[in-house]
Regions:
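Short, amphipathic alpha-helical interaction segments positioned at domain boundaries
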Residues: 122-163
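Short acidic, hydrophobic short linear motifs in intrinsically disordered regions
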Residues: 67-89
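A short, conserved structural fragment
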Residues: 106-123
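Basic amphipathic alpha-helical segments that dock to polyanions
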Residues: 73, 98-108
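Long, low-complexity, charged/polar intrinsically disordered regions in eukaryotic proteins
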Residues: 1-56, 60
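Short amphipathic alpha-helical elements of helix-turn-helix/winged-helix folds
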Residues: 57-65, 76, 101
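Residue-level detection of the helix-turn-helix DNA-binding "recognition helix"
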Residues: 78, 103, 143, 147
Length: 163
């Protein structure tokens, strides 16, 4: 069976974005046409379906590296912030975009929070989480997409047929 580990991201992510858009698992918010995706960007994305592509990339990262949190995802999707005459520093992606996408993926039943421990807060006990991991339904979707693009991947990368 082909899994997410067998398919490169440049083939897998567009196919997963198309599957998620068809599946109605994710929907683009109204404000998504006006926001930048990171602090190092100057303008909003030019693609009309960028929300689905970002959600697919987030789901792929969770499937490969889960449990994973919002901060780690923001660092992974960030770039280099231009500081003028000063050296460039790492720029993080928008955490609001990542959180909203994760909330939509949770409502669709594709990812879930991983509880770690309960600590005592000012208002009583507070549940802490280690991040999010993929659910069985999410794994089924990801593996189904990976299996559907296997032939295209083998034609583009002939060495992958060994795996």
């Amino acid at each position: 069976m082909t899994t997410v580990f067998d398919i490169p991201a440049d083939i897998f992510n567009p196919a997963l974005a198309k599957a998620m858009a068809d599946h109605d698992a994710v929907s683009m918010p109204d404000w998504a046409g006006y926001v930048k995706t990171a602090v190092d960007r100057e303008r909003p994305p030019a693609q009309a379906d960028w929300w689905y592509a970002r959600s697919a990339a987030i789901l792929r990262k969770i499937a490969r590296n889960g449990p994973i949190g919002v901060t780690h995802l923001a660092q992974a999707f960030g770039g280099k912030k231009d500081n003028g005459a000063m050296p460039n520093t790492p720029g993080v992606a928008s955490r609001h975009i990542i959180r909203t996408s994760l909330q939509q993926l949770e409502e669709a039943g594709l990812v879930e929070k991983v509880p770690t421990k309960v600590v005592e807060g000012e208002d009583g006990p507070v549940q802490l989480y280690a991040g999010r991991r993929i659910t069985a339904a999410g794994q089924k979707l990801v593996n189904g997409v990976a299996h559907s693009v296997r032939e295209e991947t083998e034609s583009m990368y002939p060495g992958l047929d060994k795996y």
